[in-house]
Amino acid sequence: MDFPQHSQRVLEQLNQQRQLGLLCDCTFVVDGVDFKAHKAVLAACSEYFKMLFVDQKDVVHLDISNAAGLGQVLEFMYTAKLSLSPENVDDVLAVASFLQMQDIVTACHTLKSLAEPSSTTGESADASAVEGGDKRAKDEKAAATMLSRLDQARGSSSTGPGRELKEERGGQAESASSGAEQTEKADAPREPPPVELKPDPTSSMAAAEAEALSESSEQEMEVEPASKGEDGQEEEGAGPATVKEEGMHLDNGEPPEENEESAGTDSGQELGMEGQNLRSGTYGDRTESKAYGSIIHKCEDCGKEFTHTGNFKRHIRIHTGEKPFSCRECSKAFSDPAACKAHEKTHSPLKPYGCEECGKSYRLISLLNLHKKRHSGEARYRCGDCGKLFTTSGNLKRHQLVHSGQKPYQCDYCGRSFSDPTSKMRHLETHDTDKEHKCPHCDKKFNQVGNLKAHLKIHIADGPLKCRECGKQFTTSGNLKRHLRIHSGEKPYVCTHCQRQFADPGALQRHVRIHTGEKPCQCVICGKAFTQASSLIAHVRQHTGEKPYVCERCGKRFVQSSQLANHIRHHDNIRPHKCSVCSKAFVNVGDLSKHIIIHTGEKPYLCDKCGRGFNRVDNLRSHVKTVHQGKAGIKILEPEEGGEVSVVTVDDMVTLATEALAATAVTQLTVVPVGAAVTADETEVLKAEISKAVKQVQEEDPNTHILYACDSCGDKFLDANSLAQHVRIHTAQALVMFQTDADFYQQYGPGSTWPAGQMLQAGELVFRPRDGTEGQPTLAESPPTAPDCLPPAE
């Protein structure tokens, strides 16, 4: 017993599995779009895939450069339909030629020949031949013959631009023609309509089967020329595609400067295509380039909405903690396939294929071949902003995101965006905080064994990335290249403003911001801007209280890795900073700077009772306690009528006066001078005044962040202790200004004036809100006299 519909139903089921991403063992990634498929179907339809999969290669680099063409070819493999139009014929032809699918190649050539413009508008297709008309007439004759056979097989005599062509299929399909009739009417459009290519039945069973397929397909899909704005539109490719086993996502494209290849990721963005409908019963897990549907998937946990089932599934794993993707080498689990693939690549960090022209090495021979196009002149896509050349238009488009500032690749975990998929993949690894792989040489830890292997290169005596001058090891060729400039003295990057030269382009970029005043890295909490991202990161951690760097020996935490490294030197008693005068060594340069004061004779810390100077603040405090019995320098302050008394002693003036500087979005707390004198003691009054002012501000606005401000450079801190530690870099300026009238007034500069009758005794201070005394000048309102101080970069 025969079942005529069986083969059709099997193919339909395979197509549904492909559209839903079920049981697919192969995935293409072209221009950021995933194409899922079955190896068996690919091998049955393409001689190229048949030979490819016989070799059992898991990851193969293909020279396929457009998503639109690949989508049409895959659609043909599973549905026996090929929607050709003048807009997509070049894309389809390029893919079909590469995959050795001769039937599609012939159909594309036929359509292109029919699409050539006629010499006379009103003439029929037979009489409107252009140059090379003999060939075209031959093609049209062949098309007419095929149409006649198709009409006989189907029992149909339908004509017109919308007819569907069928081709005979015996293992491999025969060539097919376009859907335009040879005897087209004069008033019909000259541009041939889209063509649907179907198999021709060769038996009665096949005829019935094809008839049913034809009827269902006519109801299912309306054939139209590709329109702009849809996902299926013609688009320049982004570079070679990658075929691999399911769950492994590799992007196409040219290898970046420091990495052997770019790995594709899912952007995590909801690319809504409003008003466009998916074919009934499909969900599109970022599949081929068709219009996405209006199906909305809403997360019940957080309310986030998605139009792609695949992105929705990946997002759900954030809440469930599911990690279905595992490394084939070490079995480590991941929730995102892109992160898994990035991890797997670290198991084989060697790059055996080297470029003879420049020496750059790659992991895959296909990537080396792509790179060689730069030297051969095939890299014809040039960036208009920086002049850099690319071998594919897709790579150029991704590169231009750097100049435009667009960041289309978003992390599903934290929402952070990236301009390229490789950066996103590296970022995904940071969400895996388990660092169980420890370096036996330096105790450094890694969350992946591949990263540990790459790190071990620096300990190998004869590693592949070793500096021949000093023997230092590196994990990437780019880092070694930059390091070699230290020995050669090469500084190829020149500032156009001051002609200063730099060995690294990033250093030049940061330097130029000094001239332009650009501070692109802005804190979203307080609005402060920085010239570089590392300074902003350190600053934001002051707001959040985050201290991610922990000392394993004592448990102390730090904001920056450089602070932790400096702290570890104390444990190891490493003192790299030596005094040039006495050779005494110090852990950090700050301690050395304080020590040098001994040799220079500078005494910035003054007693305002007797005027004696000291080179250290603790010596000043000791002097006050012993010589003046701890009472010297107490300032007797007379409050204004109805006000409160606040007292500052010399003993605590050095620290408390700087700690007292505070700022918020609501009010400014600062030190101001007053007129007469009353008796009081103890500095706790000043602390109480600070607490009262802070409490008042927070009562008015509970969301207010109290920031303690440095009067010299304007930097703000979350607590007074941090401010006090920071202020040491200003020593004479920030501290001495409280000691004498002259120094105090100099802080305002020659252009500032004081209200008449306000000559004060030295160091008399009171702590008040800025708006507490109208018209009275404050330190915070004075122009800064010290240069901007940025937090140290990591």
From Swiss-Prot:
Residues 254-263 have a biased composition (Acidic residues). Residues 1-104 form the BTB domain. Residues 203-216 have a biased composition (Low complexity). It is found in: Nucleus. Residues 132-142, 243-252 have a biased composition (Basic and acidic residues). One of its GO terms (biological process) is positive regulation of DNA-templated transcription. One of its GO terms (molecular function) is DNA-binding transcription activator activity, RNA polymerase II-specific. Residues 784-794 have a biased composition (Pro residues). Disruption phenotype: Mice produce inviable embryos which are severely retarded in early development and do not undergo normal gastrulation due to massive apoptosis of ectodermal cells around day 7.5. Residues 260-299, 628-709 are annotated as: Interaction with MYC. It comes from the Eukaryota. Undergoes 'Lys-48'-linked polyubiquitination at Lys-388 and Lys-472 and subsequent proteasomal degradation in a TRAF2-dependent manner and upon TNFA stimulation. There is a cross-link at residues 388, 472 (Glycyl lysine isopeptide (Lys-Gly) (interchain with G-Cter in ubiquitin)). Residues 628-794 are annotated as: Interaction with HCFC1. One of its GO terms (cellular component) is nucleus. Residues 116-285, 769-794 are annotated as: Disordered. Found in all the embryonic and adult tissues examined. A zinc finger (C2H2-type) spans 297-319, 325-347, 353-375, 381-403, 409-431, 437-459, 465-487, 493-515, 519-543, 549-571, 577-599, 605-628, 708-730. Keywords: Developmental protein, DNA-binding, Isopeptide bond, Metal-binding, Nucleus, Repeat, Transcription, Transcription regulation, Ubl conjugation, Zinc, Zinc-finger. Belongs to the krueppel C2H2-type zinc-finger protein family. Homooligomerizes (via the BTB/POZ domain), multimerization is required for DNA binding. Binds to the C-terminal helix-loop-helix motif of MYC which inhibits ZBTB17 transactivation and growth arrest activities and renders it insoluble in the nucleus. Also interacts with HCFC1, MAGEA4 and TMPRSS11A. Interacts (via the C-terminal zinc fingers) with GFI1; the interaction results in the recruitment of MYC to the CDKN1A/p21 and CDKN1B promoters and repression of transcription. Interacts with TRAF2, interfering with the binding of UBC13 to TRAF2, and inhibiting TRAF2 E3 ligase activity. Transcription factor that can function as an activator or repressor depending on its binding partners, and by targeting negative regulators of cell cycle progression. Has been shown to bind to the promoters of adenovirus major late protein and cyclin D1 and activate transcription. Required for early embryonic development during gastrulation. Plays a critical role in early lymphocyte development, where it is essential to prevent apoptosis in lymphoid precursors, allowing them to survive in response to IL7 and undergo proper lineage commitment. This is Zinc finger and BTB domain-containing protein 17. The gene is Zbtb17.
